[in-house]
Amino acid sequence: MATRGHNPRANNEGYIGRPGKQWLQVNAKTVNIDGVDIKEAVTGGQYAPIPNMIHSAAMHNGLYRGKNLTEYFESGQMSTDIADGTFANIYIGDYINKPITVNGTTYNVKWEVADLDYFLHSGDAETTAHHAVMFPSVTVQTNVPMNDTNTTAGGFKGSKMWGDTIPLYVTGIKAAFGADHVLTHRELLTKTVDVNADSAAGAGWKGSTTDWEWTDVDVNIPSEPMIYGTAVFGSSGFDVGNKEKQLAIFRFKKFSEGRKWFWLQAVASSSRFAIADNYGTASFTDASLSYASGGVRPYFLLR
């Protein structure tokens, strides 16, 4: 059946034939919702003006942009758009350039938006405030061990990392962003290890976490699922806790800009913790490892 010049409707909608001319006619149409020209907003990369009906953490977690939000944060508007849950001009991969000082050393950090509302409604004391998970684009500090010796006794909560190193980052991040912008939330952290129990990491390894505890957290290092979307070398389900899903940024950006490994919370055995390797692999290493090729890459919740 010939279709050239077929015109099914009086207003030319659905016109078939002469594609060059007809595409220009269709493309010239304005799609307007709530006073916003959607075609202009999308083709111009201006996501923020799109109507509020599609502004949410769920929608914005599915878009990677990579825009510098430093001035936006300093203006105070970013915190307003987080607090109301619209995240109106905040997308995954957007970032804030903000140096932090840790134990007397200042690090210039590009803090990327890694996820929106990751911990919302989680915790024994429910997290009800909207938030953005901020995660450095690179490993911040190298030559930092998880423990002084090759032991995982006490789980992650009993580690030197949690007891000594993380508090230094809490101080540095609160000083840089303002304490009111750092959301305290609740996480399950492992606290006991049975050195004789089989590790879920396999390979005949011994040492498995056996308990956890709800803990106030301002700053932390990631779990395995936050990076990979699943447990890999974790010794048991206790290593996952309430950090059981992948951060949105790792669905788009599966690398560290500086190619340095970083520690993860999971106990792998009686002497090892999990790491995200600088070669792009899920891995593990001795708890006392202190080396220039890796270290600490902490996250916090911005409000």
Indicate residue ranges for each PLM-predicted region.
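Intrinsic low-complexity, repeat-rich intrinsically disordered segments enriched
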Residues: M1-I50
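Collagenous Gly-X-Y triple-helix signature in extracellular proteins
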Residues: Q46-R303
